[in-house]
Amino acid sequence: IDAVFTDIYPDSVKIGMVSSDKLICKIAEKLREHDAKNIVVDPVMVATSGAGLIREDAVEALRAQLLSVADLVTPNIPEGEILTGMKIHNRDDMEDAAEKMSREYGCAVLIKGGHSLIDAHDCLCENGEITWFYGKRIDNPNNHGTGCTLSSAISACLAKGCSIKDSIGKSKTYLEGALKSGLDLGGGK
């Protein structure tokens, strides 16, 4: 992290799955130390199967250290449930969870609805304002990694100077195009 920030200061930072509480704390410390900007945290904690991917101590480190340095946090529905302690069944629940996380961590929160069975609508809470980003479920077996791809695209747009809302809109359009074209976004499960 020091090598990157002291060589070419990044215009955005995207953090994905980090399974160690010690690493999470060190990353948060370094992001603060270097006064990083446009930090997107995709708290990868739950596999598509529903299996937990990181230990509870790492979840606690995310809550206590990393989420508070983020400008945008992008949990999916199961991750939003873990981070809020709420059940998310519908649009109102998504809004409530996004608002709760945004207040608690002082950042924008995008709850990704891709785990919903009906649609792929995402709910953003930024500065107390709710914005919905609508998306259709696209029949494509290559959907592993779509959340990571979305958060990476958002980070790239932020680096180019786009607002959070514009970054999300552009990134959803990009991801939808990739899925429609059958682009293989990953094969791991």
Language model regions located:
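Conserved N-terminal subdomain of the carbohydrate kinase-like
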Residues: 1-52
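Conserved phosphate/ATP/ADP-binding segment of small-molecule kinases
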Residues: 56-130
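Short, small-residue alpha-helix embedded
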Residues: 81-82, 140-164
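Glycine/charged-rich beta-loop-alpha catalytic/anionic-binding loops adjacent to active sites
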Residues: 128-139
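Charged C-terminal helix
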Residues: 165-189
